[in-house]
Amino acid sequence: MTEQNRPGTFEQAVLPHLDAAYNLARWLTRNEQDAQDVVQESCLRAFRFFAGFRGGSARAWLMQIVRTTCYTWLHANRPLQKAAEFDENLLPDSRTPGPEEVVLQNDNGAVLRKALEMLPPNLREVLILRELEEMSYREIAEITGMPAGTVMSSLSRARGRLRQVLTGLTNLDTMSHPQRIGTVST
């Protein structure tokens, strides 16, 4: 590849995947501005090393760079958090939520986003790549550096954890908002 056609080729390979890159960065950093910074840094790295790209899936190649950049950024900018396999203390407290919170909690999308953010990063990552970005096991394996079998077992664990978290969130919502079955008249 000549220097002259490098920018055009790079744009053709990378630009179609920027939304997926941002989505992954957003879920890993949990912050829109940080995700934008990570994607920008990832694109700079991708451009710098584009000459080394040997073909194949440009999407998987870019997502691998985004993933690595995210973890590097998180390590440098956030205190190291040791994630327990599943920490019950991460579930929201059982206080009665205000009216605005009730509306958000009843919205399935908001509950799902909250549940996804409660997963450990390694499980959240494979779930986002598979379910939201619709990547194959092979692509996820390429991005994460895991064998395909490990990707499948991680996805199974992630789905199980997500189910537990969603059940916990749903139970908390119904406990704090019990339905009236009937009234007792005197």
Task: Describe every region a protein language model picked out.
Residues 39, 141:
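The alpha-helix within a helix-turn-helix
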Residues 126-130:
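A short pre-motif secondary-structure segment
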Residues 8, 89-117:
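Acidic, proline/glycine-rich intrinsically disordered inter-domain spacer in sigma factors
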Residues 18, 26, 43-47, 56-79, ...:
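Σ70-family region 2.3-2.4 aromatic/basic alpha-helix that recognizes the −10 promoter
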Residues 1-23, 33-36, 47:
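A short, charge-rich alpha-helical start-of-domain segment used by transcription regulators
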Residues 64-86, 97, 105, 168:
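Arg/Lys-rich amphipathic alpha helix in sigma70-family domain 2
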